[in-house]
Every structure is written in C-alpha cells, then in structure tokens.
C-alpha cells in the first residue's frame, strides 16, 4: 500500500505546477477592465500565441488611482510568460510603479526542478508549485504561494472558497 501511495504521489506531483494551457486554447486575447468606485481606471490585457508545444502569454497592464484629483498610485507593466507544453519555462516583466522601475526575470531550471528568480524584490530559487500572480491562470487559486509579477517576491497565500455560483 505504501508503494502505491508513493507511486501515485510521484505521478501526480509534477502536475501541480502546470498551467493547463489546453483550457485557454480557444482564446487569443483576454481583456479586463479595472474599475474603482464604479469608474474605469485602467486595463489588463493578455495575448496568447501558440507554436507547436510552445505558448507565449503577453500581459499589458496600465491603471492609475486618483484621490481628490491627485494620482496616488500608478502602474504600467509589460510581461511575457513562456510555456513548453504546460510547464512555465520563463517569465520576464518590466514595470513602472509610482515612477519606480521594477522587474522580474524567471527561468525554470530543469535540473533542480525549481524556478530561478532575479527580481527587484527577490533573488533566489523557489518551488515550481509557486504560480506567477497573473490572473488569467486559474491555478493561482490553488497555489500556496505566488510570485509577484511585478517584483519577483514570493507571497504565501491562503484561498478560501466561500460558495459555489448558482
């Protein structure tokens, strides 16, 4: 029985880090509008390009928050996620957040089976169970940690589902 459980774990474990790219095969673009207090303040676009087993997901985001007419928070960012089959193999982003430059350069190390990250807030390795925190990928809701798409920092998270849509 123990051998069966270990074998089952080894078969299922690699599937934790995959993005299920097939779920997005029919999409070439996802557009999200960003609202604050009912007012449109920006956008978040995802573009999907496929070539064989490779998928490139490009992300563009821009928004600004104003308070009493003054800009108090502003983000403009561009990022690229590259997948081979369902495995994220690289992620790169450049962001201007409140006039500060931030970045992430992530590579999948196939030898160690970890992500190597050079970012404006984090340099090091992390588990492939961590998900880049871009909202097109539903796996973000199942992960115990996410990689900031702006700075590369690792953020622990707990997601609690409060009910099913009826």
Q: Predicted regions: what is each one?
A:
Residues 17-78, 93-100, 152-165:
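N-terminal cleavable signal peptides for secretion/export
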Residues 47-52, 83-85, 108:
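Short, low-complexity Ser/Thr-rich regulatory SLiMs
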Residues 77-89:
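A conserved amphipathic terminal alpha-helix motif
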Residues 25-27, 92-166:
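Solvent-exposed helix/loop surface patches that form functional interfaces
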Residues 4-13:
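Sec-dependent N-terminal signal peptides
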